[in-house]
């Protein structure tokens, strides 16, 4: 049970080091990243919904991935921006900390489940194109997305519940810009070895449960693409899969550092650097990764801009 320590009711987010002037510069940079992230991912969701050329499983999954990117950055960045404007440390109450950590982990878990599904979708499209529409039909896609969302949110209930049954009596200063799990474990005066081991096993299950199908499917995809006789066909297939692979490398690399370690408090002081990759950089890059290398999306964007210009003229 929670004890009556100040850390059990509120925490102080240490945020970023540096002067007030540096904080204002960082605020401008991250605010720009946040706006571009919101606009870019919203545009992807809109064109996937309205453009008939993008009515396929690949773009259906991409629309949901963009929604998840908006959520994960919105859970973290507004709080971080507010902290950059305030002098000193930022106070966050226990209830807000619980909600933030749960939503962050739940959305992240959902995203990895969806990335695994996207890898399987690309495998079927490249390696079994004649049966693609039969296997990846609308019912299958809706079911996969629903399972990903439900799994992501249900899977993180127990880990977050356990985190806030610990007693935080060492300190209530979190060396991060949000309620980071590794930092919270460092502040606990309980013996957290067993808890950390269970959290490690759960992280391994989520990340490798998604990463292994991704690696296997990409291996099959590459071997299939290399058998395509025309160079233009190979180039087009590689371009389609490269965007997904780029997103996978950034996302998995960051989260493997953050969560796949037996002792969660190990190197926890560097978590804020990698957390920036997950919550700021990856959602920012997502629209560029999936649009600049995709001819269909570029054409849909171009036509959408033309229609908007015509509406304004009229």
Swiss-Prot record:
InterPro entries: GPCR_Rhodpsn, GPCR_Rhodpsn_7TM, Olfact_rcpt, Olfact_rcpt_6C-like. It is a multi-pass membrane protein. The keyword Cytoplasm does not apply. Disulfide bonds join 97-189. The chain crosses the membrane at residues 25-45, 54-74, 100-120, 140-160, 198-217, 238-258, 272-292. Coiled coil: none annotated. The keyword Zinc-finger does not apply. It is found in: Cell membrane. GO terms for molecular function: G protein-coupled receptor activity; olfactory receptor activity. Residues 46-53, 121-139, 218-237, 293-314 are cytoplasmic. Residues 1-24, 75-99, 161-197, 259-271 are extracellular. Keywords: Cell membrane, Disulfide bond, G-protein coupled receptor, Glycoprotein, Membrane, Olfaction, Receptor, Sensory transduction, Transducer, Transmembrane, Transmembrane helix. CDD domains: 7tmA_OR6C-like (cd15912). Pfam families: 7tm_4 (PF13853). Glycans are attached at residues 4, 190. It comes from the Eukaryota. Its main location: membrane. GO terms for cellular component: plasma membrane. Belongs to the G-protein coupled receptor 1 family. Odorant receptor. This is Olfactory receptor 9A4. It comes from Homo sapiens (Human). The lineage of its organism: Eukaryota, Metazoa, Chordata, Craniata, Vertebrata.
